[in-house]
Regions:
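Carbohydrate-recognition beta-sandwich/jelly-roll modules
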Residues: 1-198
Length: 198
């Protein structure tokens, strides 16, 4: 009971692709899905590890692991903000995310992720380690069904997001993400080259 969300994993010469088959999602209760997070801890790094994330903020930016800036993390819609999305989500944006990509550099290992399906319905999140979560991690979150959410008790220790309205229409685009492993000692230059050659 609950939800069935089919995900297909496939390997190619580029790397590994994870695809959510939206037409086969089943909702078996009165509760419905609004957003889907895909592989949130893929490439996560502990507090002891050295590295950075590359995010598509403008033409690209680097977020160093364990940098102490733990308040909101990085949150950005791919390409631009949807005018129908919540004002609270829009307020966190910095530059427009111009490319559907993000990168992970962890010690000697590096990978580039390319969002290959559902990019315009995707929001990218990145967080560095803190007292609550001892990991540095980055992930895409896709909007399966649009909704309106308000923040309640935002100036307290226990703020709540309350969903007021959800649309019946769901996304008919499969959400897909390609992880491309890079050569040893790959860095942000190698990530840019891999995306250019993709």
């Amino acid at each position: 009971e609950g939800f069935i969300v089919p995900v297909i994993y496939s390997l190619s010469s580029y790397g590994m692709t994870a695809t959510i088959l939206n037409s086969e999602i089943k909702e078996t209760t009165e509760n419905t899905i609004t957003k889907i997070t895909l592989l949130p801890y893929w490439g996560a790094a502990s507090k002891e590890e050295d590295g950075y994330f590359v995010v598509p903020d403008g033409s690209g930016a680097i977020i160093n692991f364990n940098n102490g800036r733990t308040a909101n993390g990085y949150q950005q819609n791919i390409y631009d903000t949807d005018g129908l999305m919540n004002v609270t989500e829009n307020a966190i944006n910095t530059e427009k995310a111009l490319m559907p990509i993000f990168g992970i550099k962890n010690g000697q290992k590096a990978s580039l992720a390319v969002i290959t399906g559902g990019e315009s319905q995707c929001r990218l999140f990145s967080f560095v380690s803190n007292a609550t979560v001892p990991y540095n991690y980055i992930y895409p979150q896709f909007t399966y069904r649009k909704s309106t959410t308000i923040k309640m008790l935002s100036k307290t220790w226990y703020p709540l997001d309350v969903t007021l309205k959800k649309t019946k229409k769901v996304s008919d685009v499969n959400f897909s993400l390609l992880y491309m492993p890079l050569k040893n000692d790959g860095d942000y230059v190698e990530m840019a080259t891999a995306y250019r050659n993709y």
